[in-house]
Amino acid sequence: MKKLTALWDIDEQLDSVHRDIELQEMILDSRLANTGCLFVAIKGHRVDGREFIMQAIQNGASAVLFETDLVEQHLTVSFEQNIPLIAYYELSKHLSHIADRFYSSPSQRLTLVGVTGTNGKTTIAQLLAQWTQILGHTSAVMGTIGNGLFGQIKEASNTTGSAIEIQSSLDKFIRQGADFAAIEVSSHGLVQHRVEALTFRAGIFTNLSRDHLDYHHTMENYAQAKKRLFSELNCQHKILNVDDEIGATWLIELSKDDPDVVAVSCRADYQPDTKNWLKATALSFHSKGTTIEFASSWGNGILSSPLIGGFNVSNLLLVLATLLSLGYDIGKLLATVRQLTGVCGRMEMLSAKHKATVIVDYAHTPDALENALQSAAVHCQGKLWCIFGCGGDRDRGKRPLMAAIAEKFADSVIVTDDNPRTENPEQIMQDILTGFQQSSAVQIIHQREQAIKTALQSAVENDVVLIAGKGHENYQIIGTTKYHFSDQEIVKKYF
């Protein structure tokens, strides 16, 4: 609980009654306003929260903090129905720091690890929380699948929540007993200053490939957004995938000011020239997962993991390097790695006797689809099937690229609907089809359930069917409505 006057120096503008206002929470949604809350009205990309100030007051908000475009209005107080309205210049940019102060700097009261990159964020965040929990911690996670203590995750609307949601969630996790948290840090979250005030004990870079160009416009802008986690924010340990060209470049740049940057590679021939490093020296893929021999500046060892896919080698090594950087004992890590389990919708394998093997994966970018298909091929002794689509109201440029990848790596391709949102599914399909050299060989089935059913009825034992794009999602967005839909449920229905 915070007093209004403890947050800003505005005593002289308030009478004794308003000086004693006690606030219990910060909120952005006026519909959730109630007594004891500070309603925050920011100028968003789609909605201007200032238009809902009166609704928040009517619902019981005890005070309002709103964004002003005029620097001379900064921290001036006005009143509406005896409720104080505090103007704040460039509020969006400073909201993370305000929420940090309001919730007593929660990121400094536990071990927080941030994960950024195009692919792998969810798997790495989940593995960090899972592994530390196995080692005796109470761990939390925030990201694409949802937020909460590990094993008690609730669905979230964005990969990286609002500045307020992040700080309030961390505070809540601590009150629930958490001492470790892993958070997926999206490029949007970095550009929009949502993680600005966080103290990261470690930050991980996974990789960079085409995604979100509808927002960032260029790959250079996209890369610079990701780099902010390491170059501009409070990040103690920096763990980089140097097999990625951007990661290798950042290693050189960041090492100039921080000699402890950690280089991670899946290549046995990688020659580290940094103080801290970890690399795979031998890999073995089998039906039960992957075995990884590694060498590192902390020592050598063997990891046996149930995770499938070459890119999960990189994910697991990045997790291992992070925990070693944080001081975890290498012996305890190697002794517990077998207890790790896969992540929902991330190369999730479903099988039944005398049926094709099905892999459900979240792959929705060209690079992710290529990785998923190459990984699926390792476990395929027959035909490799690929079912995919592309989301509506998103980057159109990646659609033909994904088609070309599906055609190159799969034996049979079915193009279906993903989340068309408000875009015409037929237009999405036409964009995709331009990427095929022989589109006549491709099956087009808009209804996603029918597409999955067709593949499962056609595929035979020893075939592998990759269902890409939705992963953990249990919904399909058509228009502006979310309908219940789960790839996994459909597979089990027709198995």
UniProtKB/Swiss-Prot annotation:
GO cellular component, as recorded: cytoplasm
Binding site for ATP: G117, T118, N119, G120, K121, T122, T123
Species per Swiss-Prot/TrEMBL record: Histophilus somni (strain 129Pt) (Haemophilus somnus)
GO-annotated biological processes: cell division; cell wall organization; peptidoglycan biosynthetic process; regulation of cell shape
Protein known as: UDP-N-acetylmuramoyl-L-alanyl-D-glutamate--2,6-diaminopimelate ligase
A matching Pfam family: Mur_ligase_M
Binding residues for meso-2,6-diaminopimelate: R394, D418, N419, P420, R421, G469, E473
Residues binding UDP-N-acetyl-alpha-D-muramoyl-L-alanyl-D-glutamate: L28, S30, H45, R46, V47, N158, T159, T160, S186, Q192, R194
Modified residues (N6-carboxylysine): K226
Location relative to the cell: Cytoplasm
Role according to the record: Catalyzes the addition of meso-diaminopimelic acid to the nucleotide precursor UDP-N-acetylmuramoyl-L-alanyl-D-glutamate (UMAG) in the biosynthesis of bacterial cell-wall peptidoglycan.
Top-level taxon of the source organism: Bacteria
Keywords annotated in UniProt: ATP-binding, Cell cycle, Cell division, Cell shape, Cell wall biogenesis/degradation, Cytoplasm, Ligase, Magnesium, Nucleotide-binding, Peptidoglycan synthesis
Cofactor: Mg(2+)
Chief location of this protein within or outside the cell: cytoplasm
Motif range (Meso-diaminopimelate recognition motif): 418-421
MF (Gene Ontology): ATP binding; magnesium ion binding; UDP-N-acetylmuramoylalanyl-D-glutamate-2,6-diaminopimelate ligase activity
Involved pathway(s): Cell wall biogenesis; peptidoglycan biosynthesis
EC assignment: 6.3.2.13
Family (UniProt): Belongs to the MurCDEF family. MurE subfamily.
Post-translational modification: Carboxylation is probably crucial for Mg(2+) binding and, consequently, for the gamma-phosphate positioning of ATP.
Catalysed reactions listed for this entry: UDP-N-acetyl-alpha-D-muramoyl-L-alanyl-D-glutamate + meso-2,6-diaminopimelate + ATP = UDP-N-acetyl-alpha-D-muramoyl-L-alanyl-gamma-D-glutamyl-meso-2,6-diaminopimelate + ADP + phosphate + H(+)
HAMAP family per the UniProt record, alphabetical: MurE
Enzyme's top EC category: ligase
